[in-house]
Design a protein with these regions (language model features):
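Extended, charge-rich alpha-helical interface modules
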Residues: 2-67
Length: 67
């Protein structure tokens, strides 16, 4: 399989993971009362921040690889 295809697929996945975490954070911040299953808003946002940081770290890592 072409390395470029793999690299592009990984970038797309990590960008999607990052966008998902950022969207969740925006929802929690704009309407925390509407999220019934998350009584710990700080914990829920912290979890999404961790996901965002992890996705960004992966993006940075593959950008620096010698393909």
């Amino acid at each position: 399989m072409n390395q470029g295809i793999i690299r592009d697929a990984l970038k797309a996945k990590y960008k999607g993971d990052l966008a998902e975490a950022e969207a969740n954070i925006r929802v929690y911040l704009s309407n925390p009362v509407g999220i019934g299953e998350h009584s710990d808003i700080i914990g829920a946002i912290n979890e999404q921040v961790e996901k965002a940081v992890h996705a960004q770290d992966k993006l940075d890592y593959i950008k620096n690889l010698k393909w």
